[in-house]
Amino acid sequence: PRRRRHAARPVRRRRRTRRSSRVHRRRRAVRRRR
């Protein structure tokens, strides 16, 4: 039997996450530096 992932708790889909925003910030910094 296949296991279902995160079936127990419903999660709202969010486009932005802390991780993506952090990466964005890093890219901006690098751009400014160059």
Swiss-Prot record:
Protein name: Protamine
UniProt entry keywords in alphabetical sequence: Chromosome, Developmental protein, Differentiation, DNA condensation, DNA-binding, Nucleosome core, Nucleus, Spermatogenesis
GO cellular component terms, semicolon-separated: nucleosome; nucleus
Superkingdom to which the source organism belongs: Eukaryota
Annotated organism of origin: Perca flavescens
Primary location class: nucleus
BP GO terms, sorted: cell differentiation; chromosome condensation; spermatogenesis
GO molecular function annotations of the record: DNA binding
Lineage: Eukaryota, Metazoa, Chordata, Craniata, Vertebrata
Tissue specificity comment: Testis.
Described function: Protamines substitute for histones in the chromatin of sperm during the haploid phase of spermatogenesis. They compact sperm DNA into a highly condensed, stable and inactive complex.
Subcellular location: Nucleus; Chromosome
